Amino acid sequence: MKIVVSSEGRYLSIRITDGTLIIGRSSSCNVTLQDPILSRQHCALTRDVDRVICTDLGSSNGTFLDGESI
């Protein structure tokens, strides 16, 4: 399964396999983006059979999916 992440007008295609991916600014994240709006550990993407669950990890600016806050 593949998703697209938008950050500062750029788009990043991410393939999600089993397990959880952490997105954020920290080098400890699976996906690191140097966007000042992102928290060090911003959100988690977890694949669940035929869908992806996005969980905000207490980020300062929130996490949005198709313009809607989650």
Where are these regions (language model features)?
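Forkhead-associated
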Residues: 4-6, 10-70
